[in-house]
A protein has these predicted regions:
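Conserved class I S-adenosyl-L-methionine
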Residues: 1-47
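A short acidic, Gly/Pro-enriched loop at the edge of an enzyme's catalytic core
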Residues: 100-111
Length: 262
């Protein structure tokens, strides 16, 4: 089953909107700068702010970073609870699944997806993206992928595996097998090429430190945990907590950016 076909997981985030906004990470500054460079190139030399459509915007984490960097943003988000947390950040948000969204003849220099492209049907989304991009416009797909550093990762993965016997792990990775980052071509690349886009991948690495509370709070905003039985989820959190030192953990974000020209 593709991620976008699993509606229980795709529609699970609203119940955790506050924690999602508080604990999901921002994107590396260099990744945001790369998106802005592409958007400004698409906008041309007339000194206007680049227009960006941010799809599956959630609580506006990526969108607010792009707005701060100087872009004019329209966010599209299917979950009303998530959208309500994005609007106070100064974002215009339209509540809709992207597959049902009406562009109303509007066009954009860049279309971005932050941690969200896997939740849309590419056979519907990619043709729509083509219609809303200005000539020379760019599609940007971004995923944060944060893992503990060292042997703690092995212990936490083993704990997650005991609770997710279907092969899911605690977070959504960006490439290779489901929920696991691997240094192989991202599966979206073939979808983009098949739709006539020319994609290029870049990875941005940030070294991070998390308190025990913040790490666990982040992990339990992922759909693999949000769709668990609540009692089972609480036990999993307790067992993971027992593995993490009181002073927290070091982690690495290998954030992936795919820029694709139409």
């Amino acid at each position: 089953m593709e991620y976008f076909e699993n509606r229980d997981r795709a529609e699970s985030f609203g119940e955790a909107a506050q924690d999602y906004d508080a604990f999901r990470p921002k994107y590396p500054a260099a990744l945001v700068a790369a998106i802005m460079e592409a958007a400004e190139a698409s906008a041309g030399p007339d000194d206007r702010a680049p227009r960006i459509l941010d799809v599956g915007s959630g609580t506006g984490i990526l969108a607010s970073q792009l707005r701060t960097a100087g872009a004019e943003i329209l966010a599209v988000e299917p979950d009303p609870a998530m959208a309500e947390l994005a609007r106070p950040k100064g974002l215009e948000v339209e509540v809709s699944a992207f597959e049902d969204w009406d562009p109303q003849s509007r066009t954009f220099d860049l279309v971005s997806f932050g941690q969200s492209f896997h939740w849309v049907d590419p056979s519907v989304a990619l043709p729509t993206i083509r219609t809303v991009l200005t000539p020379g416009g760019t599609l940007a797909l971004a995923w944060n992928d944060i893992e503990p550093i060292g042997e703690l990762k092995t212990r936490l993965d083993a704990t997650a595996a005991r609770f997710h016997t279907d092969g899911r792990t605690a977070s959504l990775g960006t490439a290779g097998a489901e929920d696991t980052f691997a240094h192989v071509e991202h599966p979206a690349i073939a979808q983009l090429r098949g739709a006539g886009f020319s994609p290029k991948e870049t990875t941005f690495v940030d070294n991070l430190h998390y308190s025990k509370h913040d790490w666990l709070s982040m992990v339990f905003t992922y759909s693999a945990q949000l769709t668990m039985d609540p009692v089972k989820r609480a036990v999993m959190r307790e067992e993971m907590s027992a593995e993490i030192p009181e002073d927290g953990l070091d982690a690495r974000n290998e954030a992936l950016l795919v820029l694709a020209s139409a």
